[in-house]
Amino acid sequence: MIYPEFPKKGDTIGICAPSFGVGHKLEWFDLAIETLNDAGFDIVETESVRNEAFPSAPADIRGAEFNSLFADNNINMVMSASGGDYNIEMIPFIDQKLVKSHPKWFAGYSDPTSIEMLLTTVLDIATIYGVNAGSFDWRPLHKF
């Protein structure tokens, strides 16, 4: 099992929308980004994150955006913006060779479970079944 280096203050988290975008709740999502920034992380969002559409973009676009975060050596961790119902559609567009050669933590819960299953069981990369990026909108953060 590959355990990527855990992100630390000053690292960059890439956020993608493999299912739903967050356009319907931008105020809350902006608060979540602010919380992550306040915790010391830089944030990079893919183009579809702030879309209102369900899904956030066609499956091939969502897959390409996911791949771009793993290809970027400046990104230390990848998180799903939110849950939804459409992650399974983008699985065929995940470049497994690319992801395996650039292992990073991927975090999300609910619909992102399908991505975590692929990364953990097929690519042998540990993942985090935990909050999506949009879940950091609590002030103060809940103690887990």
Question: What are the functions of these language-model segments?
Answer:
Residues M1-N74:
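ATP/NTP phosphate-donor binding region
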Residues P55-F144:
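Active-site histidine-anchored catalytic micro-motif
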